[in-house]
Structure formats: C-alpha cells, structure tokens
C-alpha cells in the first residue's frame, strides 16, 4: 500500500500548494504602483480584513466601479477584493472590462493575468503576463507571477528560473522566496520548501500569506502544533483564528491530517 500513500500525498501536496500559489498570484498586485492593497475609506490592508469587512469592501468599491468602470485603479482594487471573497469569475469579468478600456496599461495587464490565473485560465494568464512584461524594464512582480503560473502548469524548472530572475532584480523579496518555496512543496521536497519559506518569513515586510505558506509546509511534514504556532504569529486574535482556519482547511483536504499522521508514524499498510 506504500504506493497508494505516496499517491495520496502527491494529490494532497499538489492541491494544497496550487491553492497557496494561487493566493500568492492573486495578492501580487497588492504591491504594485497602482493599488495600495488597502481600502481608502478605512486605510486597513485587505489581508487584515475579516469576512464581513471584505464583503463590505467589495460592496463599497463595487459602487465606485459602477460609476467609472474604465478607471484602472478602481477596477484593479475591485478585482482584488472580489478574489479575496472567493468571487474569481466576477473578478475576471471586471478585469476583462478594465483591460478593454486600458489595453496598453502594464499594471492592468498584470492584474488581468492574475485574475485569469485565479479563475483557472492558466495558458491565457501566461500569455497576458508575458504581454505585460517589457524586456528592457523587466518587472520582478511579473517574473514571480509568471513563475507561479508555470508551476501550476507543471513546468517547475521554468518556474524556478523565473523566480531566480525575479530575485536578481529584487533580492530577498519575501513574496518571491515564498513562491519559490511553494514550488518545492509541489515537488514534495518539503525540507527545501521550508528553508525558502523560513527565509521568506524572516524578511522585512513579509505578510501573513508568507507565514501561512510556511505553516503549510511545516504542517505537511506532520508538525501540526508548530504549524499552528506559526500561523498565529504577530496577529490579532481574530486574524490568528482566520489563519489557523485557512491552514486547517488546506491540511484537511482528503482527510490530510489523518493520512499524513498515519504516514509519518510509519503506517503504510
């Protein structure tokens, strides 16, 4: 039965890592020049909002979008919040309209590509990201996003090359190191993944999503208590509970907690 345990672990790792990388791709626009990653009315970062606040933010920005659907900044912010609410198809529809109105805007093309990736349109997303990139002024965010998409397409060697190119432009950037670590999660090399993710989490400006990815890599190795401790770090009680819920939701796919615990204790019969 060892082969079936390996198969279960492979499916689990791929499903969990793709979700985490998808979050990284979706969040990448939060550091761009066109969007601040926070809602102007409250000044609160999107990543720190609870579910109710995210719904309210979607309603508020949605009203601004309806008034001026051609505005790039409003459209990108709206799509970001929609993705945080799990409304990927609607986010993609928003970015399609914004891209029609701003066909040469590099930030819009980047956000459009990320929306396509979040909606599962990976080949289209890759093409859009490549259109947004300029060889004479390469953007590390686009390099990292391209790598994340390539990882989801199963092209890990190319993906890691893009991450390293991004690191050449922006050394020690936490989001790039995090995506590189998740690439090794996909390859089931959890020790290497943990090394990169710990480095990512130690960088100035590392956000909650980076710690979530580290917690995932630790949890997938069976160190569940340590994973929860990482997920709770430097957050308010509400944010910590949200992070732990996120971690558990990923690790409970296909009864992951039980399967991995049994596997780690040597129960392969």
Regions found by a protein language model. Name each.
Residues 22-77, 81-85, 93, 269:
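N-terminal leader/linker segments that initiate helical-solenoid repeat arrays
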Residues 33-36, 204, 208-210, 214-269:
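Terminal, low-structured helical/coil segments at or just beyond the last alpha-helical repeat
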Residues 67, 100-102, 132-136, 169, ...:
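Structural marker of alpha-solenoid helical repeat scaffolds
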Residues 72-73, 106-107, 139-141, 156, ...:
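Helix-start (N-cap) detector for alpha-helical repeat units in TPR-like alpha-solenoids
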